[in-house]
Amino acid sequence: MLLAIDCGNTNTVFSIWDGTQFLATWRIATDHKRTADEYHVWLSTLLSLTRIEARITEAVISSTVPRVVFNLRVLCNRYYDCRPLVVGKPECRLPVAPRVDQGTTVGPDRLVNTVAGYHLHGGNLIVVDFGTATTFDVVDADGAYIGGVIAPGVNLSLEALHMAAAALPHVDVTKPPHAIGTNTVACIQSGVYWGYIGLVEGIVRQIRLERHAPMKVIATGGLAPLFDQGFDLFDKVEDDLTMQGLVLIHQYNKELE
């Protein structure tokens, strides 16, 4: 079975793929100090609790936190006797190479989302990922990543507002019933929610103008469903887009062996 690992700035997601479907998906806070042994104990406990008899023989990793990759490699080598495929490393091939400025490093999560998005929806595509940062990835007609946009993430914006303005509380993002808030919490929630609706609409509109094409828009990330309530922002919300991309990239590299 394949162990797919998506390490983001906030959380790290582990999924077990049996060749046809994901048997389980688990999430843990990203911590560069966490050892391979700790990962193994955590994973083994979850596998036991869910009664999944998974014999992991292969692994693929995407990580936006370089310091975490070493211990994830050790986890795979020591406990599963496999060498993980790491997206963004020279040994990892992509179906179509990104077309960006020479010397530019593209986040592996963005490359993975591009591969999955193209596989599921074809080219001329915008992938919006609501993560620690809110990213917009543009996929050309042939499946190549050709650039995009990086904006502060929703929760990051809320935290920054709370940290910079002592009188403002930390609040959770939600869809407010009205744009005009009648208390401080409602005002903040309205500003963030409607502000990000406007951000998505504006950036998508500008990308379409520059591309001279009716780009399809898909969304992923934990907060994507929140911004898909009653609006025509996205053609589709894909909950496990990154994991699907990791499986596709692993399969592609296996075929090249």
UniProtKB/Swiss-Prot annotation:
Compartments, as annotated in UniProt: Cytoplasm
Enzyme class of the recorded protein, top EC level: transferase
GO biological process, alphabetically ordered: coenzyme A biosynthetic process
InterPro entries tied to this protein: ATPase_NBD, Type_III_PanK
Catalytic residues of the enzyme: 109
Gene3D superfamilies: 3.30.420.40
Keywords for this protein: ATP-binding, Coenzyme A biosynthesis, Cytoplasm, Kinase, Metal-binding, Nucleotide-binding, Potassium, Transferase
Residue positions binding ATP: 6-13, 132
Function: Catalyzes the phosphorylation of pantothenate (Pan), the first step in CoA biosynthesis.
This protein's name: Type III pantothenate kinase
Protein source organism: Cereibacter sphaeroides (strain ATCC 17025 / ATH 2.4.3)
